[in-house]
């Protein structure tokens, strides 16, 4: 099983995938985030954040106040399972997390916490 995926983000406020499947044989999983647009991160920055689907709205709203220097995430937010930093055009960042943190029977989601992006930039994470 390939225990990694590359997710591209764009100036059109989108990720190139709406669903990430993790093979249950993976002990860890790595997400590399790229930005194929041309806009800088203060204008059209994106990050990749993993949480339970239920925690997603709260993380995003709390993150707005944190600002770009904290990647639009509240410091020490225990609801965040994994995240990249905010990147702009031509940049990339990656994060590796322990698959055992994903409990069976819980719905997980990924999203961008840049203010206003969550409505378009989100998807599901499942372990199969």
UniProtKB/Swiss-Prot annotation:
Localization per Swiss-Prot or TrEMBL: Periplasm
SUPFAM superfamilies from the UniProt entry: Cupredoxins (SSF49503)
Keywords: Copper, Disulfide bond, Electron transport, Metal-binding, Periplasm, Transport
InterPro entries on file: Azurin (IPR014068), BlueCu_1 (IPR000923), BlueCu_1_BS (IPR028871), Cu-binding_ET (IPR050845), Cupredoxin (IPR008972)
Disulfide linkage: 3-26
Gene Ontology cellular component terms for the protein in this record: periplasmic space
GO molecular function, one term: copper ion binding
Domain (Plastocyanin-like): residue spans on this chain: 1-128
Record's keyword annotation contains Glycoprotein: no
Pfam families attached to this UniProt entry: Copper-bind
Residues noted as binding Cu cation in the record, renumbered to the chain: 46, 112, 117, 121
Record function comment: Transfers electrons from cytochrome c551 to cytochrome oxidase.
Protein name according to UniProt: Azurin
